[in-house]
Amino acid sequence: MGAHLVRRYLGDASVEPDPLQMPTFPPDYGFPERKEREMVATQQEMMDAQLRLQLRDYCAHYLIRLLKCKRDSFPNFLACKQERHDWDYCEHRDYVMRMKEFERERRLLQRKKRREKKAAELAKGQGPGEVDPKVAL
């Protein structure tokens, strides 16, 4: 998990996205029929369940079900294993999706930098395979 932090400090920081900032590329870039992620739990449901701000993510509806199950079957804490599993699995999928988005952003930044470098070389007249006239003489 810390590899992106090491690459930021030891590698080229211009092609490493900041994990605390929003992505710079649109989410449907390269995926025209990609659907936008939507929250299942509404703001009112999360307020009614008194969820902390850190827990209000795309898996909040599973957490609300888990907390309700724990409340309803209080002494029997093992009764909510399926709800706990559903919430953990949703958190895992969310984490994997965020890591894929981070990697996608990193690759798009690298591609953008390569294209800018290639355009700058072509503007100077020194593209790949071309020889500078001074060197040719």
From Swiss-Prot:
Biological function: Accessory subunit of the mitochondrial membrane respiratory chain NADH dehydrogenase (Complex I), that is believed not to be involved in catalysis. Complex I functions in the transfer of electrons from NADH to the respiratory chain. The immediate electron acceptor for the enzyme is believed to be ubiquinone.
Localization per Swiss-Prot or TrEMBL: Mitochondrion inner membrane; Mitochondrion intermembrane space
GO cellular component annotations of the record: mitochondrial inner membrane; mitochondrial intermembrane space; respiratory chain complex I
Chain ranges for the short sequence motif Cx9C motif 2 as given in the UniProt record: 80-90
PROSITE patterns per record: CHCH
Notes on the domains: Contains two C-X9-C motifs that are predicted to form a helix-coil-helix structure, permitting the formation of intramolecular disulfide bonds.
GO molecular function, a single term: NADH dehydrogenase (ubiquinone) activity
Segments carrying motif Cx9C motif 1: 59-69
Membrane-spanning residues: none
Name of the protein this chain belongs to: NADH dehydrogenase [ubiquinone] 1 beta subcomplex subunit 7
Phosphoserine: residues carrying this PTM: S73
Lipid anchor positions (N-myristoyl glycine): G2
Residue ranges of every copy of the CHCH domain listed in the record: 56-98
Gene that this sequence comes from: NDUFB7
